[in-house]
Amino acid sequence: MKKIIDFMEENVDGRTLFTKELVYELENGALQGVYSDQISFSNLKYSQSGFQIDMFIVSNEKIWLIDKEGQRDKLRKDFSSVSMFRFELAMRKSTNAITGCFRFISASGKNVPAEAVVSGIYDVRLENSVLKLSESQVLYRDQPIQDGRYKPVAFQAEHRFYCEDGKLHYEYDGRCFDVDAKTMQRRHSSDTFPPFISIEK
């Protein structure tokens, strides 16, 4: 774990990164999302058994209804906000593995989709100077669909931290699942998202 904490202290804590605008489709093209952000990592704290670090995100995210001609019609939802999340990780003596959680702390704005959402973090490893970890969201969160409605979804993702030319890179590659809110069963969603790649300037 010391190598991972050293990596976080040297390469991640105190860094600010930017995600260029990217576009994704929802509901088989009925909606279109446009996203960009600024991410800052700070407040790294650690003990003999674990560590935590905060992630501040200033995001600009809008979801549009798409008309029959494939053009943006009406703004369905504006998720733009300033949010704070926290990674909390610890070493497990039973397996010598690092596990923990990634959770929402606070945000500006109303009806924040990540509010009260927690993800489990596992498979944390440092390979060839790349810090990798896997995320699996607990339960479900809301995702806007047509006609002013929402559907329950959950995400699984891979996170990667690495440096190129002295600049920190952070990659988030997520997969969306539709969730049966009664049974909590998941099935692959038709909604797909490109990898989010944030780079320090």
What spans do the regions from the language model cover?
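Tryptophan-anchored aromatic micro-motifs
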Residues: 1-37, 45-62, 67, 76, ...
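Short, exposed beta-strand/loop patches in secreted or surface proteins that constitute
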Residues: 8-10, 23-25, 42-46, 56, ...
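Residues that act as N-cap/strand-start positions at coil-to-secondary-structure junctions
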Residues: 11, 18, 49, 81-83, ...
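Low-complexity intrinsically disordered segments
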Residues: 13-16, 92, 96, 180, ...
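Edge beta-strand at a domain terminus
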Residues: 40-43, 115-129, 137, 148-159, ...
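Soluble ligand-binding/transfer domains with enclosed cavities or grooves
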Residues: 53, 59, 80-87, 92, ...
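Flexible, membrane-facing loop/turn or short amphipathic-helix motifs
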Residues: 61-70, 76, 106-116, 140-149, ...
